[in-house]
């Protein structure tokens, strides 16, 4: 959010940080916030165990704030929003704890119409403002912005519409 508001290149910032050998470039690709089915639960458990004496509560608040800022930014754009897949990691068949899923649910709570392309959602129940689509062409049709936690090959031809934090996709 800091870099986005100042028009800084996230790619250049990350690459600069990765030059430090203690950090490296192996696992440093931002997303809409950390998630998944283990990390959020484990982070909260550790924060509960060690309380305010450690940095973990600040990390949890920062992650929640990151998603909140992304949601507010998307709403402020006043665009027709689509979401490509709700999973946290590429090739995963699980969306538990996904930041993209959290973003969808917040948009849904506000009654914002969103079309979603994700085969895993076929049996899920959503409010009227959420529509499931079956093809990339349907996803692309009549939309301004496509939210994608990761840049998939399927999205390359419409990448100019994709809103992602994936700097290597």
What are these regions (language model features)?
Residues 1-169:
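Structural/interface elements that position substrates and couple domains in central-metabolism enzymes
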């Amino acid at each position: 959010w800091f870099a986005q508001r100042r028009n800084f290149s996230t790619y250049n910032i990350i690459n600069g940080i990765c030059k430090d050998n203690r950090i490296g470039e192996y696992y440093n690709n931002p997303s809409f916030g950390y998630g998944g089915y283990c990390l959020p639960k484990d982070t909260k458990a550790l924060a509960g165990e060690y309380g305010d004496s450690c940095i973990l509560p600040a990390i949890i608040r920062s992650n929640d704030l990151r998603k909140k800022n992304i949601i507010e930014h998307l709403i402020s754009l006043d665009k027709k929003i689509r979401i490509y897949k709700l999973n946290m990691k590429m090739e995963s068949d699980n969306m538990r704890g996904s930041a993209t899923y959290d973003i969808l649910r917040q948009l849904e709570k506000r009654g914002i119409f969103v079309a979603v392309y994700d085969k895993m959602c076929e049996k899920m129940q959503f409010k009227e403002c959420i529509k499931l689509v079956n093809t990339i062409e349907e996803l692309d049709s009549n939309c301004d912005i496509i939210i994608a936690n990761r840049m998939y090959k399927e999205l390359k031809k419409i990448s100019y519409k994709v809103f992602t934090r994936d700097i290597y996709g």
